Amino acid sequence: MKKIIICILTAGFITNCAVENPENINTDITQTYFTEFMACKAGPDQSTATMTSMIGEWQQLLEGDSLVGSWGYAPAVATNSSEDTIWWELQWTSQDDANIAWEAWLQNEDAAAWEEKYTSVLDCDGENRQSFDTAYPMASNAFGELPDSGYFYAEILFCTYENGGTKEDALGFLAGFNNAVNKGGYEGTSYHYGNYFQQGNEDGFLWGNFTNSKESMDKATD
């Protein structure tokens, strides 16, 4: 891996799951899924109570089953490269389905009212959301279930290709990495990971590590 990919830690986050449908059981660990990220800023009225209310009302507005999962990433340390940006991740059944869902959202008067109501809680840049093809090579419960609260810990690394490395090389690395992790004593950490390949970026990709706590992350990445 070091010959073709160099990874640098860019951010640590406390993560919360807002919506998650049953996990995909496809056994092809190199298969990718369409994912979007929106950059968000906390408003003056943000609190646990207002965020809970905001997410609850948002879930009531969702239509169909094209949204597979949604996660929010809040900075856990002051040294994050993204500073105070909160990231909202959306995983879809396909890019076409995502586009259809967004078009319906933009025409939904109740959705517009929801955005206006909660703009002082969380302001997200949906217009400039970023598109990724994402591989999830390991089940989220491979090394223990995540907390019932829905919160877990994430570290995001930016990986650059070296010596002519490509996305295909990165995907080809996954099977060997899984084998190493399975022998690494990760039990009880809830460790799993994802590789996020931004559309139009041929220089590298994001590697996300996920665990049930900061202590588990330290154990898994030691």
Where are these regions (language model features)?
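Sec-dependent N-terminal signal peptides
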Residues: 4-13
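Short S/T/G/P-rich N-terminal loop/turn motif that feeds into the first structured element of a domain
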Residues: 17-87, 91-222
